[in-house]
């Protein structure tokens, strides 16, 4: 791998700026002695160099191609403050138990980035390096943003504290469900599903990622029937209720139009998909802030680049970007459900969303300290293959500040949708009470649920139907680190 502290940068100006091709390390993109400044943006890449490519040179190439470099010396370098603008790879370490892979730490001067723009950050950090031929694969594992840069983002328009105040719901997770089937229902039937779920005890119902405005149900019809259901359920229960109205559309103008209509109908929350893009997400966040609306983000499409641990972008990075971009909710995994997610790694995603200051936590995949500079917190959402029988696991893993969404676990209940919602609400209330009484819910959870089911027929039916069903598959994305007394 070579001597990582070897002074290999060419400092002689005549040689450094002579026409021709130099190694990236020679051009100044590697500095093993560099100490990152408090104002630097830091990135950790997992790189897999091609056979014969030195790890340090590969790291320097990542730094170069994600900042100022091109493949050859250019004379215009002498017209800029190159020493400041060059990103610097400053540490390379072998990835434990993964031969041929290396962790590459890169520091970027803050002046390389436009303030308040996730789009600009991503254009630099992931814009070019992932298709670079000397690398077999590359993955962005983690990032650290200085407070000076964090402060250029307004962050979530509502945040956890204000959302709970608006809903008047404290001391427990929020409950939701995605309307199923997610495609094909008429507006009237869709609204009926929403009413049944909310009337049975859920706090939220939700559009799924791909329900927009299709021939079987125009978006305006859906909004009208859904909000009629929300209002009736609120009146019947005396609770503030909501339903995530998906305003995702083909243009920003259309998304604004749909969001405005949702507001006029009295909705407290709108939803967009990750696939609309970072600029559109920030634009919708600004609209929600100006209109006192909660913004829910469905992470549709993320698995195409977050799931494989040797190439792509870790979801913990996406979660950090989205907290800066300004969403109030984000789907962050369940650990026990049907979707990808190692429990420790998923807890790391939740910490990124909810911490005031995120500490290094290698078992959970957190490689950098991150001071969030009083930025509002994001409410993580657990959704996908969960049911009432897992309530003790979910509460133990994620605590109170989470939305637990039981789609099939509500709408698939043998006694109907309202009974499914009631089963989930009773399971949650029983588990929160047991926890507050000091009981060990992680181990006593199944018995707590059985005891509650004695006086709740819907919960008993849910437990009989799904029992302790879980999706026990090995996760493809786990943290790689060497256990030591400080991190084990």
UniProtKB/Swiss-Prot annotation:
Residues the entry annotates as binding substrate: 128, 178, 182, 299, 331, 383
Cleaved signal peptide residues: none
Active-site residues per Swiss-Prot or TrEMBL entry: 180, 298
Co-factor requirement: Mg(2+)
Binding annotation for Mg(2+): 206, 208-209
Cofactor note: Binds 1 Mg(2+) ion per subunit.
Positions bearing the site annotation: Transition state stabilizer: 338
Additional note from the record: The basic functional RuBisCO is composed of a large chain homodimer in a 'head-to-tail' conformation. In form I RuBisCO this homodimer is arranged in a barrel-like tetramer with the small subunits forming a tetrameric 'cap' on each end of the 'barrel'.
Assembly information from the UniProt record: Heterohexadecamer of 8 large chains and 8 small chains.
PANTHER family in the cross-refs: RIBULOSE BISPHOSPHATE CARBOXYLASE, RIBULOSE BISPHOSPHATE CARBOXYLASE LARGE CHAIN
Role played: RuBisCO catalyzes two reactions: the carboxylation of D-ribulose 1,5-bisphosphate, the primary event in carbon dioxide fixation, as well as the oxidative fragmentation of the pentose substrate. Both reactions occur simultaneously and in competition at the same active site.
UniProt protein name: Ribulose bisphosphate carboxylase large chain
UniProt organism field: Variovorax paradoxus (strain S110)
Primary gene name: cbbL
